Swiss-Prot record:
Protein name stated in the entry: Large ribosomal subunit protein bL17
Keywords recorded for this protein, A-Z: Ribonucleoprotein, Ribosomal protein
Organism, as annotated: Acinetobacter baylyi (strain ATCC 33305 / BD413 / ADP1)
NCBIfam families per record: L17
Lineage, top ranks: Bacteria, Pseudomonadati, Pseudomonadota, Gammaproteobacteria, Moraxellales
Coiled-coil segments on the chain, per record: none
Protein family (similarity comment): Belongs to the bacterial ribosomal protein bL17 family.
Gene (name only): rplQ
Molecular-function GO term, any one: structural constituent of ribosome
GO CC terms of this entry: cytosolic large ribosomal subunit
Pfam families with a match to the protein in the record: Ribosomal_L17 (PF01196)
PANTHER family named in the record: LARGE RIBOSOMAL SUBUNIT PROTEIN BL17M, RIBOSOMAL PROTEIN L17
Record-linked InterPro entries: Ribosomal_bL17 (IPR000456), Ribosomal_bL17_CS (IPR047859), Ribosomal_bL17_sf (IPR036373)
PROSITE patterns (UniProt xref): RIBOSOMAL_L17
Assembly with partners or alone: Part of the 50S ribosomal subunit. Contacts protein L32.
Amino acid sequence: MRHRNSGVKLGRTSSHRKAMFQNLANSLFEHELIKTTVPKAKELRRVAEPLITLAKNDTVANRRLAFARTRSAATVGKLFTVLGPRYKERNGGYLRVLKAGFRAGDAAPMAYVELVDREVNTSAE
């Protein structure tokens, strides 16, 4: 029986999964838009959204928890100085997953993961 077993394995060991989602979350918080496969994007929400919720309350304990989960001082700094205040009034739903077709090599379904309410650079002007 698989009762209470949530999360997808994605064909990886638990340590590989943990490292992969840590790296994906760090990239997402740094760039605010990343492209990945749809299953990874959907699972990334379960990792990244609680970190933003944590960043809404800036305490030393919360900063230490965020660092324990990301292992990146730059990410923690951005979470608590930029992203936490940005989403102070929003109750969840900080990420948007947009389908982006299929990858050329193996036809894997791809998706963009972006932070809602991010500043979009319009450098085409």
